[in-house]
Each structure stands twice: as C-alpha cells, then as structure tokens.
Amino acid sequence: MAGRVEGKVAFITGAARGQGRSHAVRLAQEGADIIAIDVCKRISSNEDIPAPTPDDLAETADLVKNLNRRIVTAEVDVRDYDALKAAVDSGVEQLGKLDIIVANAGIGNGGQTLDHTSEADWTDMIDVNLSGVWKSVKAAVPHILQGGRGGSIILTSSVGGLKAYPH
C-alpha cells in the first residue's frame, strides 16, 4: 500500500533533530523524498537547548535512507535567502520536483521574559522565526507552482503563540 505522500518531495527546514527530524522521518515513512536543511550551529547565545550539529543532520539523513527514500541535505541558515534558494534549487535538481514545504526552523530566547530579552536575541528570533519562514517559502514555492500539481505549505510555531509564558 502506498503512503499518503508517495512519490512527493518535501523541503524541511530545521531538519537536524526534534520536530524537523520527526517531520522528515514521518513524511519518508509515507513515501516522500526529502530536502532537509538546518543551520547546524547556535544562533542565539540565549537559547536554552543545545545547538544542532552536522552529525544531527547526518543522522536525519540516515533515518530517511533506512526507509529507502532519497534525501538531499544542506547546512543552511534560514536568514540567508540566497543560500536557501540554492539549497532548494539543488534539491529539486536532484529529486526532480517539489510538492511540500515544511517551514519548521525556529529558535527560542531561553524562556526569558520580555523585560529580560536583549535586543540582539529579539532580532535573532524575528529573523529566524518570522523572516526565515517567509524566506523559506519564497525560495521554495516557485518550484511547487512550476509543477502545476498543487502542493502543501506547512508552517510550525511555538507553543508560546497559544499560551503565554508565566511572569
């Protein structure tokens, strides 16, 4: 029995681990090939979780390959539109098309309240969590439109968008 996305290609940001890895593995289980990117380094000094690494991204690739699906990976910062576009273009060239965008990359501020968040940390969060999503979709959506088959765009967010942090 074919999976729900059999033969499709998905572009996933923040794919080295966590939700991004989970999306890559699940979509591969359902039959998709994957274009996976991650910055693979710390962006903000105030983040409270360890930074993703190139080894993390390689592990995601191995998990997808073990499902007999193809995967193209790149270390890319979603704040860098030109690098995003180059990674998506390369992935589409290798895999033939694009059907799904999962803009998942994001950072936190270590749980700091607004009055303790530095301007630099705020700028990093906006540049990754908002502008990075727009840049990711902008870099990828022309391939979906060019395919003429329709497609899906999935944008993830923080639980902070649903429930305020205490303090």
Model-derived features with residue positions:
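Conserved glycine-rich Rossmann-like NAD(P)H-binding loop of the short-chain dehydrogenase/reductase
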Residues: 30-59
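The beta1-alpha1 cofactor-binding region of Rossmann-like NAD(H)/NADP(H)-dependent oxidoreductases
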Residues: 54-55, 75-87, 119
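Residue(s) in the substrate-gating loop at a strand-loop-helix junction
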Residues: 158
